[in-house]
């Protein structure tokens, strides 16, 4: 049996074929930098629990400025985080994907956590659409940097939510245990 080990495999014609993963940017939001074919990307450093109130604010760790490689037809944005209730047993929030400070209306989510739960916010962004449609996150082309992030708020004062917090850890409740989020961008040709 033979083994081939390479650092990077690039097809001769990287624009041919469809449905291929062209690159993946993925990491724990601890301030790391990730280098790919299309550039070097820095993830935010999440070191604290984030308490939401009733005003929309950027979710820490969710922001990335990204340019997909040539030949990309779809970019998949994926943000994994831990959410939980601030005071009572229940929490509800509203979260939305923004691209260059424009709301992707169809991406609206309203996750609710009883005490605490994992949340994955995942959204495909079309890069070769026949027309731009920011309501669903599609563009005729994507050749320069765009900033992607999640904006969120609590449903109301009685349902405040915390991001990046386990709520319970090692037999005790209402902890300040920080769970760092994971951000993943996948470019598909």
Model-assigned labels for residue ranges:
Residues 2-43:
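Glycine-rich, low-complexity segments
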């Amino acid at each position: 049996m033979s083994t081939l080990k390479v650092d990077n495999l690039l097809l001769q014609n990287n624009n041919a074929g469809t449905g291929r993963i062209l690159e993946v940017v993925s990491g724990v939001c601890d301030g790391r930098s990730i280098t790919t074919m299309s550039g070097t990307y820095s993830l935010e450093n999440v070191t604290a629990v984030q308490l939401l109130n009733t005003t929309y604010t950027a979710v820490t760790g969710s922001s990335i400025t990204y340019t997909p490689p040539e030949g990309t037809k779809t970019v998949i944005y994926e943000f994994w985080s831990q959410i939980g209730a601030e005071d009572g047993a229940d929490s509800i929030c509203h979260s939305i994907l923004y691209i260059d400070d424009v709301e992707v209306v169809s991406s609206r989510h309203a996750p609710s956590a009883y005490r605490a739960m994992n949340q994955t916010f995942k959204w495909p962004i079309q890069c070769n659409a026949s027309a731009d449609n920011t309501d669903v996150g599609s563009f005729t082309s994507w050749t320069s940097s765009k900033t992607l992030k999640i904006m969120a708020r609590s449903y109301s004062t009685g349902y405040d939510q915390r991001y990046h917090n386990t709520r319970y850890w090692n037999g005790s409740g209402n902890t300040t245990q920080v769970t760092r989020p994971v951000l993943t961008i996948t470019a598909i040709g």
